[in-house]
Amino acid sequence: MEFQHTTVLLHEMIDRILTDPHGIYVDCTLGGGGHSFAMAEKLAPDALLIGVDQDEEAIEAASRRLSGCACRHLFVRDNFSHIHDILTSLTIDKVDGFIFDLGVSSHQLDDGSRGFSYMNNGKLDMRMDQRNPLTAYEIVNTYEEEELARIIWEYGEERWAKRIAQFICEFREKKPIETTDDLVSVIKAAIPAHARRNGPHPAKRTFQAIRIEVNNELGILKAPMEACVSHLKVGGRVGVITFQSLEDRIIKKAFKEMERDCICPPELPVCVCHHHRLVKSIGKAQKPSAKEIEENPRARSAVLRVVERV
């Protein structure tokens, strides 16, 4: 299947991140190369663009797309949680800008074989990195009921989490839950009919929760933000696009902490942390325009936040 992904907040991201056309930029979630391609078109031949992604298909697609770009560019197959080690291995200390476009790509959602989508049937997988040993199949078929309920509640904010976990465990006693369609059927059976009539697809929140658990999406967010800021030149920027409230809260909190001089507990009468402000916000959090949402409904929950090193 050809790698296809509609990039969200494309021009908004590039306009805010690009500060020096001769600089070094890192796209930490390369995907199909949408942001990187738009960035590369504005970079000088001596600039360096680094693309990082754990998905081999994404690396291959971006490599083809950027093959004719004038600027220097290279790709690294890795998780952005290792950004410090990646830059160290490339003997790069300071960077002009970092791009993060979090969440699942359109390609991953539309390719049923990847097991991300409740709309396209396929084996339960949901791994962004195919080298990851943990799959959605293992979570759904081996996790204890209490742990499943916790994940679905915390990561999916699903009000029927306990009931869904109960139904999953009862169903798998008869036979394994092997496909996304199997899981959707169990979820629909667990959620009362009156609760399924309105709102999003009944499986949306549970699928989100399992995907987050498979890829440890929330657990790896804060540390890379701190690492990126430590590698920013003064005036360099980090831009992050989130697609759900859990991610956005983590990013917002991480940036707020780095914007503060003192991070001591409020009950301390005197500052003892000696923490200095590292960044400042560039504009307000930005959401897609009504036109973009109309053209790409998946963009409706996107939020862009940008900070600059001071």
Where are these regions (language model features)?
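S-adenosyl-L-methionine-dependent methyltransferase catalytic core, i.e., the SAM/SAH-binding region
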Residues: 1-310
